[in-house]
Amino acid sequence: MASLLRFYSDDLYGIAVSGAYDVKAHKGTFSVDTEYYPVPKSKDVDLSLQCKGQFNWEWQIIDCLTFKMRVSERLRTWGVNTRTDIRTDFCYAKDCISATARFNVLRCRGTSFVNYLEGGYKRNNLNVYARQGFFIVDNWDDRIYVYERDAPGSFNVPAMYGRGLWTSLVMAWRFASVGRLYARASYTSYPFMSEEKKKPGKAELKLQFVFRF
């Protein structure tokens, strides 16, 4: 277990505590971060306090099947007082085949959902991953960030907002000892939005060649 005490004169005081455990078939980590702001964050409150906590748990059910869960909570004295995020992953991996089912629910101003299924193939010089998901996020404060596979050097973590579907296909191919080809194609649509809030779909196609000498 570790702890950290932070002090910033006139701006912020904080303390953080974290820990981890690992036993047969189970392991987990936790962290708690508390902050006090001497200058109120809102004119509606006299005291500005914020506490963030997160717990991660992983269970190796059998050799090829793993269950992962992440629970995080944010408490504060101004604005929306609570923000609860619960995410679960069922992960299968055997030989060259992998699959993941994610279920993510977040509660802040309202309740939002992001779920997806992903299948993967990884063998020697070829990696391929396909993902299909849907999201229901009606408030910007309830947005959920999702890490998307992409080419090296690209940081792709979009904020899911609205009501829609998305599909992505990512490939990495080593075609020679010095060459790599990375490809990504994706499409996001919003068929479940109301007429007054309807948004156009978004399509992406990316090719990246890397040569190493």
For each feature predicted by the language model, list its residue ranges.
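Exposed, low-structure sequence patches enriched in small/polar residues
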Residues: 1-213
